[in-house]
Amino acid sequence: MSVRARRLALLLLAVAGCREGGVSSRTAVAGGNAERGRRMGVAYGCGGCHVVPGVPGAVGRVGPALGELAGRAYVAGTLPNDAPTLVRWIQDPQALRPGTAMPDLDVGPRDARDIAAYLYADHAGGLGPPHLLPRRWLGSH
């Protein structure tokens, strides 16, 4: 086994160990219901601006794609990516980042928790996006 293959295997084992149940304590949404959150995302029209995994027709290109959100360091580019911040962001984005393009959709607390739970859910399975792995470990394909 090459050095690159050994490093990749160790990294994959380490990452797999960090994803107990697919949700970290940072992204666990207390009281959130992911399936209801998917439905609420449709009801609030999130797919008009965002690509949302598991939501047919959610192919908007105004805001960022929302897949693999749990693996990102920030929400809205500057806010720490944790459950309380994401819930507040969904409820009142203008309060957290005045002037943002994200509109205030008058999302209530329960709906915001459920939407956050859905966005943090592991939709694709696996170990996350390959762009998080060092390119030198992936080869030069």
Go through each PLM region and give its residues.
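Bacterial N-terminal signal peptides that target proteins for export
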Residues: M1-L8
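C-terminal motif of bacterial Sec signal peptides marking the signal peptidase cleavage site
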Residues: V15-G17
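Electrostatic cytochrome c docking/interface patches
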Residues: R19-V42, H131-H141
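Inter-heme linker and motif-flanking segments adjacent to c-type heme-binding CXXCH motifs
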Residues: G21-V23, P53-G57, V75-A76, L96, ...
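Gly/Gly-Pro-rich "capping" loops immediately C-terminal to redox-active cysteine motifs
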Residues: A28-A34, R38-M40, V51-R88
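The canonical Cys-X-X-Cys-His
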Residues: G37, A43-P53, L86, M102, ...
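Axial heme c-ligation environment in periplasmic c-type cytochrome domains
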Residues: G60-L69, W89-A116, D122
